[in-house]
Amino acid sequence: MKVLFRSDSSSQIGFGHIKRDLVLAKQYSDVSFACLPLEGSLIDEIPYPVYELSSESIYELINLIKEEKFELLIIDHYGISVDDEKLIKLETGVKILSFDDEIKPHHCDILLNVNAYAKASDYEGLVPFKCEVRCGFSYALIREEFYQEAKENREKKYDFFICMGGTDIKNLSLQIASELPKTKIISIATSSSNPNLKKLQKFAKLHNNIRLFIDHENIAKLMNESNKLIISASSLVNEALLLKANFKAICYVKNQESTATWLAKKGYEVEYKY
């Protein structure tokens, strides 16, 4: 089956969509991606053929599907609406798998919500009657190193681990770290695409209790070596749940609200930073 992922990444959007798509992509043998070449994107790190789009036009995507005869379109993109999905289906007949994080309407054959809070009944009336709904933690897309790390009982090197995703455009990592006691050893994980990286590096140099990890290869181990995690209410939550870690979730964008609400109801520590 020829599979096309439609997803983007950038310094503004972050890396979460592409990262989880790459986990799902391992389930298929013939995979390609269609992406906009945005600033700070992960295009060069995608180990599959990438079609660089020139616009957000749905017709450009439709033409690509027709020309390359893709059989399954996997949409992981907040900018593609239910009406766009209907148009794609009408024009191409391609099978559609749509990611969703906000309990929104979709016109797809398979609906995938990988967040722990999600349940199939949430989508009654929001998706076609014959749509296959895949929801909840059992469908979480977590990298293999987390499953391996969950078996390890690591010595705790750090009092706190902070990660606000790969780009952290609001520079919350620095803000959170500066509010913690200077007697605590704090690890901060980020990426080289973080627009606030120089500020973080300067902060780390001025504080000998800060350990800054940039593009670290094994985030799972770092998390497992920490007494408490302070993480964004994103896919990091599923990873923390798998590790059975002590964590606090920070909600700072709208698409994290459902996860944050669910965590709070379950008794987990949640903080909102808008």
Curated annotation (Swiss-Prot):
The keyword Cytoplasm is assigned to this record: no
Cited function: Nucleotide sugar hydrolase that catalyzes the fourth step in the biosynthesis of pseudaminic acid, a sialic-acid-like sugar that is used to modify flagellin.
Protein's name in the database: UDP-2,4-diacetamido-2,4,6-trideoxy-beta-L-altropyranose hydrolase
Substitution effect: H17N: Strongly impaired catalytic activity
Positions of substrate binding: F15, G16, R143, S234, S235, E239
Enzyme Commission identifier(s): 3.6.1.57
Active site location: H17 (proton acceptor)
Example of a GO MF term: hydrolase activity
Keyword Hydrolase annotated: yes
Species, as recorded: Campylobacter jejuni subsp. jejuni serotype O:2 (strain ATCC 700819 / NCTC 11168)
Gene that this sequence comes from: pseG
Consequence of changing H17 to F/L: Abolishes catalytic activity
Quaternary state and interactors: Monomer.
Catalytic activity: UDP-2,4-diacetamido-2,4,6-trideoxy-beta-L-altrose + H2O = 2,4-diacetamido-2,4,6-trideoxy-beta-L-altrose + UDP + H(+)
Keywords, in A-Z order: Hydrolase
Family under the similarity heading: Belongs to the PseG family.
Lineage: Bacteria, Pseudomonadati, Campylobacterota, Epsilonproteobacteria, Campylobacterales
Source species, domain of life: Bacteria
